[in-house]
Amino acid sequence: MEAVIKDLIRDQGVRGEGGSTAGLSATPPASLPGSLTNVKALQKSPGPQRERKSSSSSEDRNRMKTLGRRDSSDDWEIPDGQITVGQRIGSGSFGTVYKGKWHGDVAVKMLNVTAPTPQQLQAFKNEVGVLRKTRHVNILLFMGYSTKPQLAIVTQWCEGSSLYHHLHIIETKFEMIKLIDIARQTAQGMDYLHAKSIIHRDLKSNNIFLHEDLTVKIGDFGLATVKSRWSGSHQFEQLSGSILWMAPEVIRMQDKNPYSFQSDVYAFGIVLYELMTGQLPYSNINNRDQIIFMVGRGYLSPDLSKVRSNCPKAMKRLMAECLKKKRDERPLFPQILASIELLARSLPKIHRSASEPSLNRAGFQTEDFSLYACASPKTPIQAGGIGEWAVHLLKGLLLGLVVILLLVVCLPCLLQCVSSSIRKMIDNSLGYREEYKKLQEAYKQPERRA
């Protein structure tokens, strides 16, 4: 065995003239048989060198572990200069949204705070600590935040338009199945947020985005503590900008914290109203202060009579439940989601064409409601469903049949009455003529006698 080892060492050129092994390689030769375990003793490096290698490996492992984890809010902060801010998309009371670049397209919301106090900055980071844990198909993905040059939230970029834009600007022609599915996906996303103890506080059609495949993405949620701690002027602007979706208790602002799961439910009820009517509530009132006063006092509610006639009754009942004036009487999103899913299962199904794209990647692809198909929330229904024009036509035909039936039944009686009246008139006229003749004869007789 010893002779074999010496031959192997000689082949590698590591044996010195004096028979020492000072030039031995740190790795065993590839041809070394696996049974020669005694070679391991010859491969040992000096003690100090081995310790340095072990220390370096430990540091590398710690560094990789740090890079692989983002456990604190500070790990999600994007350094100044890494985000390229591009086109301005829109603005609100709380901030302005831009399209930006950061490892791809992102949405950057610059908050309306120029010099936050340490308390505000800490509140902002605390809220970010909640947002970074959200992962759902119907929620805009939180990607990070920045504090310089100003506070900003970075989320995924959604290729598509808001639900508000679809319903009230370009009037996208949705079928009823898609309107119901938009409601289902929105309820699904809100149910997830509430399960995470996140209150949206500003749910409205402007903050519900439809991706290219009509997947709902809810945005602009969270930051509740930040919104409540910043100046009252910002709160007032937010109130005036979103009053159509605000619950009565939020408008009154009598409670210390009027926002709750139920206030989000009320806002969802207004979104349902938009979906099922194609209109905004209180469109006949132009005075914003009047709306604030009447809704806050409980004198005004959305007019559910404007809901389309082809809207399922279960959806209309759910809408009325969500819009209850008393907070405790409204359902919560687990119940809402279950109701919408039950409604979807109870309606008729048809098979889709293989070439037709799926409605969304979260499921709900096979169900279609031909009886509830409509061209647009604002236009009459086209082929494929019973439209308003067909209802009016049917009513007209029924009314015509009733009139004809009345004429057939009543015409003989009417003719008889008319004929009898005419006969009486003739008889009366003849009687008057006879009496007139008698009077004439009676008048002539005295003259003859004279």
From Swiss-Prot:
Biased composition (Basic and acidic residues): 1-14, 49-73
Similarity annotation: Belongs to the protein kinase superfamily. TKL Ser/Thr protein kinase family. RAF subfamily.
Paired cysteines (S-S): none
UniProt-recorded Gene Ontology molecular function terms: ATP binding; protein serine kinase activity; protein serine/threonine kinase activity
Catalysis performed (reactions): L-seryl-[protein] + ATP = O-phospho-L-seryl-[protein] + ADP + H(+); L-threonyl-[protein] + ATP = O-phospho-L-threonyl-[protein] + ADP + H(+)
Protein name: Serine/threonine-protein kinase-transforming protein Rmil
Positions that bind ATP: I89, G90, S91, G92, S93, F94, G95, T96, V97, K109
Gene3D superfamilies: Phosphorylase Kinase, domain 1, Transferase(Phosphotransferase) domain 1
Organism this protein belongs to: Avian rous-associated virus type 1
